[in-house]
């Protein structure tokens, strides 16, 4: 018996359909918490399993599974990426000193917690200021897991070639989101960095378009680290 929190997919995208692997495996029963809200799947995965003689039970721990998959469900309903924001700040609301220099105010336990949050998201994002000031790796460490795609929101695609973001762009998907350029276009530079142009000058509109573009790329959730 296979237990899953979501209906196995039946469409072909970046990876083969899950139902094909289940059918080939010889599994005779699938217990799922609920249906996949994606119109490409919604009920079709279960139907295909039943067609091949596999018993399907739906509804076990439905509420708990909905909480686990909250970001995915939201992104499918709204057609844009779910955003989580992380801030390490003092009680008086500061994330840096008066000179703009950040200080360590978190401990080992909180850093491990943050890296757990990173691995649960499909992407991680910072602004250009944070990238230039801290030269962050934006990867999953301290815990086991695959590093998510990395995003930098910037007014320009000019990022120092010496930055960790650029140097490791061929190892982890790396995207710079800019406001100018032709609306909703994506290009890939020789260094491996992708540049997404939203065509929006307004910062608020730029972020909205970027989240729609990210969803189109199969990114249901993004973890934003400010400061």
Specify the residue positions occupied by each region the protein language model found.
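Zn2+-dependent cytidine deaminase-like catalytic core
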Residues: 1-64, 180, 201
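General beta-strand structural signal in soluble alpha/beta enzymes
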Residues: 4, 32, 56-59, 97, ...
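Short acidic/polar active-site loop segments enriched in Thr and Asp
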Residues: 28, 220, 225
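Short, structured interface segments
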Residues: 61-76
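Active-site ligand-binding patch in enzyme domains
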Residues: 74-78, 82-220
